[in-house]
């Protein structure tokens, strides 16, 4: 765990809710003072009212009644203060956690793809749920309790000195013993709370993975192995939790018993002093002091109770800050995408949907040049590896002229999808260059680069919402009519209109109520509504049956018309009309040409096409 985790958390809390926290502290001080005053008044109540009344033959209880009312008012004021600061802390807690979740989500959205490739999704979810909940307990309960306990110790200590110094010294000695014991037990359990939170994240990650892949688990009869793996992770969580709570849970009982010992010792010593008339110790003073002694020792027990919560919150905060400290996706691009129209023979920027695009390229002399968006995509001498010591692509050259359809084929792991990831700048290359209309893509803002590329990903992902919402995800300002037109273009309209509520049918669980082909069609419609200048179709038709594939291919041909298109497909029949087909093998392009020329060569592509060898 990084040092200063708790300091950083408290600094964030203070910066957002300074006024609220000041008012909370004032209320806590008020609560402590009113309670101490009530206890101190017991001395007056006993010595000045109760004892004289017991000795009087005709007692007058009016004075005692007024004294009791004063005590009741003091305690009532303490209750009001306690109620007020607790209500404020509830508001502060929920507001702070809301803001923190927003900060976490906004930062998560800025993280590079490699973070999600390397971090289990369930572990990230655990940060949003379990780790956030540890902060809820810390802010709403532990912090107020710790401040209240400290205030109680201070005010009680001062009051005890006023009443009797020898008994106060005795109480402080016992308090030191309690502090030493509490610190020792707390240090033994603290490090295990960090491991407990990490193990909890692993368990959640595994559960999320198993839920997502439950069909695969059942198809391959993997249930027993899945259960065994879960048992192992769960046992590790149980062990770390046991070690964390083994000492932490005995803190409260130990401190309570030490407090009782302190109370008994003070009672015995105080009684001896009172009976012998030392230090002017009256019955009222002794009763008030013993009550204060309870109040003096009780905060130590309360503090020990919060040690568990503080340790867990510190571990949770550490994981939260690990997420927040992840480096955001680097983007130093200056070139942006804009719509253009031709006015008096010149290209000018416009807000109209003209269907024509250009790159706004700021030059060193200060003027902005409009470069027509043609869709000329080139990779030259590209080397790339997800890890520096393991290259996935080797000296790759790809030339996609405007309006051309370029197809990539090859075995799984050959590097086809990696090429499209590089064009999107999900990853940056180690060597070579990638240009878009003659502009190095590192100069293009990532948002604009990706906006220019309509993508149908290999894994179709649909979001909870209506069919219309999922199509509109391609362009949020698209009208219903535009979404329907896009669906018709992808031939998705044929099945959507037969759904129970048509385009307003709710999809849940990643579109589990749709077939693979239907989900793929919606993904294509989503790309169509974006109306991008260029397209990347990653395994676009690999999940669609032959009949649906024919419908999709017809729609895709319309969508690809006039656009530069990069296609990855396992079904070679879908790419026969490509302008250029590139065959990849272990990160190298070993063949390139159109369908006819590659068939004539009778090389790897010919073998794939004739079925002599399998791609996967």
Predicted features, each with a name:
Residues 2-3, 26-27, 34-47, 74-121, ...:
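Juxtamembrane helix-loop junctions of ABC transporter transmembrane domains
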Residues 7, 81, 85, 93, ...:
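Hydrophobic alpha-helical transmembrane segments of ABC transporter permease domains
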Residues 15-18, 113-114, 132-139, 143, ...:
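An intracellular "coupling" helix at the cytosolic face of ABC transporter transmembrane type-1 domains
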Residues 16, 20-33, 74, 141-195, ...:
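Transmembrane helices of ABC transporter permease
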Residues 21-84, 161-166, 264, 268, ...:
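Transmembrane helix-loop-helix hairpins at lipid-water interfaces of multipass membrane proteins
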Residues 52, 159-173, 243, 247-318, ...:
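Helix-loop-helix
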Residues 57-58, 340-616:
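ABC-type nucleotide-binding domain
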Residues 94, 102-134, 205-229, 322-340, ...:
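Short intracellular "coupling" helices and adjacent cytoplasmic loop segments at the cytosolic face
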